[in-house]
Amino acid sequence: MDLNLYLKQLETLVNIDSGSHNAAGVNKVADVIEGWYRDLGWHVINHDVGPEAGRLMEISNRPADHYDVMFVGHMDTVFPDGTAEKRPFSMDEENVYGPGVGDMKNGDTAMYHVALNADPKVLENLNICMLYNPDEEIGSRYSREKMDEIGRKADIIVVMESAGNKGTRHCFARKGSMGYELEFHGQAAHAGFMFSVENASAILEMGHYIVELMALASREEDTTVNVGLASGGTA
């Protein structure tokens, strides 16, 4: 594997803002990746999953109705527009940095290098697919139906997202996830008269809930809890 080429390609992807809701940015990443594979002579199918997300890419070494092996990655990140400019790709002696460098533009690039470095005999005998998801960070909200349809064509599926940084090599199962949106309503009042008029702080109540929710986390049961976004108040 050509590490210098890998890092150069990774830098290109990391320096493109591609938050899940930035369809244009995700498609810019897709354009770059698609070019890599077309230069190898691979077959590319672009699936439109709606205007709210970038495109889903089904890439294979030949057109096929069945895949022996499928590698899966996602092109979107959790970062807002402008992050790539504020902290672009960088390196030190041990690590690389930048938005999406570990989740999972490293894996997206590695998928290409699987194709680039595959034994020709393997490519001759196996149907291999590289599937690039545009909206994984928001639960594959727009691509899930098509992802499931394509996934059923494969005998083996390997997700190329990083499994961890503490010696983990492969992850065969972990855990599911659930998400909730909670809305709190209070009774508005002037702060200077809070002891003399009826009032109730929705923000204070939300704070109590946050503390209680975080207490549900358990190291022993590997139950993790995260309050990802909280806001409230008007003045």
Across the structure, where does each feature detected by a protein language model lie?
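Catalytic metal-binding/acid-base residues of hydrolase active sites
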Residues: 19, 76, 137, 163-164, ...
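Acidic/His- and Gly-rich active-site-bordering loop/insert found
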Residues: 1-99, 120-123
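Alpha-helical metal-binding/catalytic segments enriched in His/Glu/Asp
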Residues: 71, 91-138, 178-184, 193-215
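Generic structural signal for residues in well-ordered beta-strands
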Residues: 44-45, 128-130, 227
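A general structural motif
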Residues: 66-68, 125-127, 153-155
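Broad gene-expression machinery/nucleic-acid interaction feature
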Residues: 56, 86, 127, 155-157, ...
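Short acidic loop-to-helix transition motifs that present clustered carboxylates
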Residues: 50-54, 137-139, 165-166
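Midchain, well-structured core segments that form catalytic/ion-binding scaffolds
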Residues: 144-235
